[in-house]
Amino acid sequence: MKVTDHILVPKHEIVPKEEVEEILKRYNIKIQQLPKIYEDDPVIQEIGAKEGDVVRVIRKSPTAGVSIAYRLVIKRII
């Protein structure tokens, strides 16, 4: 079974590099200020994202309709 097929898992997609710059500029932040998600997360592995990629997470929201969040993919250091 694919993790992304589960009803509770929101849609994740890799943001193209060109779009990342626009997002950072829009929110006036640096890439290191984005929330993080680990490279070994099952959804990240399934979509093929690698360390340094930015992922868009699209959730249905009862109040906002749709909620979009961005995460920076990082390696887990043990």
Curated annotation (Swiss-Prot):
The keyword Transferase applies. GO terms for molecular function: DNA binding; DNA-directed RNA polymerase activity. It catalyses: RNA(n) + a ribonucleoside 5'-triphosphate = RNA(n+1) + diphosphate. It is found in: Cytoplasm. Keywords: Cytoplasm, DNA-directed RNA polymerase, Nucleotidyltransferase, Transcription, Transferase. Pfam families: RNA_pol_Rpb5_C (PF01191). Its EC number is 2.7.7.6. The keyword Iron does not apply. It comes from the Archaea. DNA-dependent RNA polymerase (RNAP) catalyzes the transcription of DNA into RNA using the four ribonucleoside triphosphates as substrates. HAMAP family: RNApol_Rpo5_RPB5 (MF_00025). Part of the RNA polymerase complex. Belongs to the archaeal Rpo5/eukaryotic RPB5 RNA polymerase subunit family. This is DNA-directed RNA polymerase subunit Rpo5.
